[in-house]
Amino acid sequence: MFANSAFVDGRDTGYQSMRSDVWKDTDDDRTGMLAWVFEDDFGFEKYCDYVMDVPMYFVYRNGTYVDVSGESWHDFMEGKLPQLPGDTPTIDDWEQHLTTVFPEVRLKRYMEMRGADGGSFEAIMALPALWVGLLYSSKSLDAAEKLTSDWTQAERDALRNDVTKDGLSTKFRDGTANDIAKEMVRLAADGLKERGLGEEVYLKYLQTVVERGSSNAARMSELNASEWKDDLSKVYEYATFPDVLPTF
């Protein structure tokens, strides 16, 4: 729904979210879909164990970033870092280390949903509205769980891999990713209406996307092929925020 990165180095890549596709080939130790988060015993402890097993990047000391690339957090806890012998981590060190993992959803003091490309003002407003509507309503959350509960790990991986190129037209079981997206937007709208704050208005962008069945990236690729003729300066004209932001 939010795919918006089709162009790289002045050309159409054929992908709707090249940004997302790049993450598929970036340091397996700290990126990707975490299969074990779908297991019944998943909790904070398992996530902490995962983060502690991720090789370190740096420690911030006295205004300086100390390079500890590849070192073990477990060794750090025992004061055994070669670069900082005897030094043990603080809570601030832990919070810094948390920023060096990049799974699809990153757990910090909140859940960071990392799947969306940047986009228009309307898309930026739609993103938190979507997740608030889905996650802050027990009815919508239960319905979303029911929708996805029988998906296999292989199906989740295939869907994540294929949507970077094919977007909402990606095949999934007897339908497409757009069928899932439509249901997500509907459930989010129900969740926002339940809150009674009128926030469902921010989903208009996504409602248009799923009714059309194609992302903004797909739309720009179509324009490039038909009107822009590889003059990608037109992308800036098309995507620049207006001087006066829209109201809802």
PLM region descriptions:
Residues 1-106:
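Loop-rich catalytic cores of soluble enzymes, especially ATP-dependent carboxylate-amine ligases
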